[in-house]
Amino acid sequence: MPEDRALHLVLDKRKRDEDAAFEDWVFCRNQVANFELQIKQVEEFRFNYIGEMENEGRSGLTGTKLLAYQAFIEKLDNIALKQRQELERLKMLTEQKRQFYLKRQVDRKVIEALLEKHRIRRQKEELKREQKLLDEYVVANYTRRRQVQDEINLEAEAL
């Protein structure tokens, strides 16, 4: 029983660790989703900006203005590249957090299984004690009835 108390304390700690690992994993997943959205927005902005440049080009673009468009598009490309690199790093981190969470989950389940094993063992021991008491009662009852029957038989023989 005292060992179960200690195991329950360990189980509580494991649950807290698992919850914290889960929160970290979810946070990273949300970061990945945010970066994917940002990249999509930058790419959409780039696409729209190129469309604007093409429209202006049809009506005539100066060399300076064309260079300005190209420089800005290049900046957008660099931003998207850096965000994709960060996205890959975040995806790897998210997978690490997922693996860590799964390990914490296994740790908790091991303690729960051990507690369940102890509970089943105690239950079996209790059933054995109850069966022993029942057997002792049956034997004592049989012995008492047998003695009474023997006394009746002796009295009957004496008559």
PLM segments and residue spans:
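Charge-rich amphipathic alpha-helical interaction elements
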Residues: 1-159
